[in-house]
Amino acid sequence: MLTNHMQFEFPAPIMQNAYFKDSTTILVRLEDASVYQSSNEGFTWNRLFPDETILAFYHHPFTSDRAYLITNTGKFFYTTDTGRSWNHQNAPNPPNTFGAQVLHFSPENSDWIIWTGDEGCGGGANNCHAEAHFSRDNGRKWTLLESYVRNCAWARDKSLLVDPSQILCESYRDKSGSQRFFQMGSNPLQLIGGSNFYTNKFKIFDDVVGFTKFSEYLIVAEVKKIMFVCDCVS
């Protein structure tokens, strides 16, 4: 029995790697912000967009032939055919530097995406904050959702069968100053819901730690203020 053995040495340590589902195509991101693609399970490799600084990539969790390469500017690259071809679009701002997930995807429509980026963060800006936009055409046109956010995502999930147009945002109550200096308790993080693509907004919680989706449940961690009253006689 004959086996083929090929060795490829990447020029920097691997930071991220993932296959396209049910495919022989794999993406690898290196420490030097380069991305390589193999379409034959690693037998041969090709560097993608060598002139770009690529900070991360995302596979679409609901559409297995789609992936997105996030650069350090407002440009991102995407494929809709398992990496056979790549195109680019422009996001409304650079990817956020607050640790939030840059892209969120909808199970309802492959073209519905949410982008969370930096706004006003150049130099020593006093109003640096995260800003979320959504697109219904895979990034060709963007609409502002909310400023001063920590996270915005589609409410619907595979098992959480709510209004597919509803969006949830963790949004700071006071929208001024640099978000980098917000401390827990000083500026409440509200959970805001919005149906009809966030046009009909409503506050769900006044002060939250965060939310997550698990199966058919939406789980929210709320901040509870505890008051101690002492009726003491000295």
Regions found by a protein language model. Name each.
Residues 1-234:
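Extracellular glycan-interacting surfaces
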